[in-house]
Design a protein with these regions (language model features):
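Glycine-rich, flexible N-terminal cofactor/catalytic loop recognition
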Residues: 1-51
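Short glycine-rich anion-binding loops that position phosphate/pyrophosphate groups of nucleotides
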Residues: 5-8, 76-80, 156-158, 215-217
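Short active-site oxyanion
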Residues: 19-25, 98-101, 149-150
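General beta-strand structural signal in soluble alpha/beta enzymes
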Residues: 27, 102-105, 152, 178
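Conserved helicase motor
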Residues: 49-55, 129-132
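Short glycine-cluster motifs
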Residues: 67-130
Length: 269
């Protein structure tokens, strides 16, 4: 069941009625959910259900459901199972032929996407990037191959390093939107080229959604890569009077790779 991301007025009438009618509420953080229940003047039994106890608690909650009781599953904010606990109990409920009823509502990634100005026709959601360096690099390489809008979540203390990793892989000319503290008091949308945004970032606070325009001239760039070599492309721009720095920047953008990658190629020649 979805709950507000930040603005309590985003709770739906159906969600309120559901919270009132169920026997138990399984919450990611019972203290956080208790604040919402107090605001709504609802008193219910709360059971902790988070990432670290998801497997054990799922079995316990399934037993309760099999007794004929109703449970509402909520995360701290937004929709459960979207970068939050919930997937495991849904699987187990299906295996036990227990009815699952979605109670729709706020979802941070969707709300950020629809006001981003970036294509909503096709998109891939990657949640939070892995912490492990190898896994992180592999995931970014996977993103690099996509030709659709990309959506990520990121915490404030890791935002700058994540933006730099994305910039190195996709190019600093890549257009992005940062949705900060969506639906909250300090909601803000930062739009522009990733290189420019990185240079302006300071005193980073709040939760962020990163939306990447990963469809920019993708097909055209792929054709360039397939048709001519880097050396041929370099010579074409050289005859037009561009400097080496300008040529490297232009090739990197057209091939959707980092400037450093192109620079290293010509350095070895």
């Amino acid at each position: 069941m979805a709950t507000p991301i930040g603005n309590l007025e985003d709770i739906t009438l159906r969600a309120i009625n559901t919270l009132k009618s169920v026997d138990i509420i399984a919450a990611e953080d019972t203290r956080h959910t208790l604040k919402l229940l107090n605001h709504l003047e609802i008193k219910k039994k709360l059971i902790s259900y988070h990432r670290h106890n998801e497997e054990i608690k799922s079995k316990m909650l399934i037993d309760i459901l099999l007794e004929g009781k109703d449970i509402a599953l909520v995360s701290d904010a937004g929709t459960p199972a979207i970068s939050d606990p919930g997937e495991e109990i849904v699987k187990q409920a299906i295996e036990n032929k227990i009815d699952i009823i979605p109670i729709p509502g706020a979802c941070a990634l969707i709300n950020a996407l629809i006001v981003s100005g970036i294509s909503t026709a096709e998109f891939s959601f990657y949640g939070f990037l892995p912490l492990n360096k190898k896994n992180r690099k592999e995931k970014i390489e996977e993103i690099k191959k996509e030709s659709k809008t990309i959506i990520l979540y990121e915490a404030p203390h890791k935002l700058l390093s994540t933006l730099k990793d994305i910039s190195n892989a996709l190019g600093e000319e890549t257009n992005i939107v940062l949705a900060k503290e969506i639906t909250k008091i300090h909601e803000e949308f930062i739009r522009g080229r990733i290189g420019d945004i990185i240079n302006k970032m300071e005193n980073v606070k709040g939760e962020f959604i990163i939306i990447i325009d990963n469809k920019q001239e993708k097909n055209e760039n792929d054709n360039i890569s397939n048709q001519i070599s880097l050396d041929e492309q370099y010579e074409r721009y050289k005859t037009s009077g561009l400097t080496k720095k300008e040529i490297i920047k232009k090739i990197a953008k057209e091939r959707n790779v980092s400037k450093n990658e192109i620079y290293q190629y010509f350095l070895k020649k």
